[in-house]
Amino acid sequence: MRCPFCGHDETQVKDSRPSEDGAAIRRRRLCPQCEGRFTTFERVQLREITILKRSGRRTPFDRDKLARSISIALRKRPVEPERIERMISTIVRQLESMGETELPSSTIGELVMKQLKQLDDVAYVRYASVYRDFRETQDFARFLGEEGLSEAAES
């Protein structure tokens, strides 16, 4: 594997172990050229999924992009990284089990919202505000009312 620091083509695996949920192999690597250390994850990929964007563009599914968007919603929230990783793995498995090679981005958005609602209300509202394109405070109030979260917002 290529070193992300210096670009050297060969790196050494120093440690390998299964991830906590058993869905990946975590590897610690060392570059003999620059002595940089980094971690990689190896996962089974059942099929290539293409995402159909609202604009009509097609892009390959990117697990890391999914993880980043979820991490933004969960920023500064008291949720353990292991729970976040399990949630991401659950969403990816659900997408792969749909048996489709092409999925609309709205499918991912709805799965993320469903999982976040179970995990953390604040992250759920944060994600919804971007996903549903809230523009005014009334959009938040309407959403909170629809979701039965308005009482929590008032207390």
Swiss-Prot record:
Q: Which GO terms describe its biological process?
A: negative regulation of DNA-templated transcription
Instruction: Give positions of the unnamed zinc fingers.
Output: 3-34
- From the UniProt entry, list the residue stretches annotated as the region Disordered: 1-22
Keywords, A to Z, come to: ATP-binding, DNA-binding, Metal-binding, Nucleotide-binding, Repressor, Transcription, Transcription regulation, Zinc, Zinc-finger
Cofactor(s) the record lists: Zn(2+)
InterPro entries of this UniProt entry? ATP-cone_dom (IPR005144), NrdR-like_N (IPR055173), RNR_NrdR-like (IPR003796)
**Residue ranges with Basic and acidic residues bias:** 7-22
User: Any binding details for the cofactor?
Assistant: Binds 1 zinc ion.
- One Gene Ontology molecular-function label: ATP binding
**ATP-cone domain spans which residues?**
49-139
Q: What does this protein do?
A: Negatively regulates transcription of bacterial ribonucleotide reductase nrd genes and operons by binding to NrdR-boxes.
Instruction: List the PANTHER family hit by this protein, alphabetically.
Output: TRANSCRIPTIONAL REPRESSOR NRDR
What family does this chain come from, according to its entry? Belongs to the NrdR family.
Q: What is this protein called?
A: Transcriptional repressor NrdR
| Organism the protein comes from | Phenylobacterium zucineum (strain HLK1)
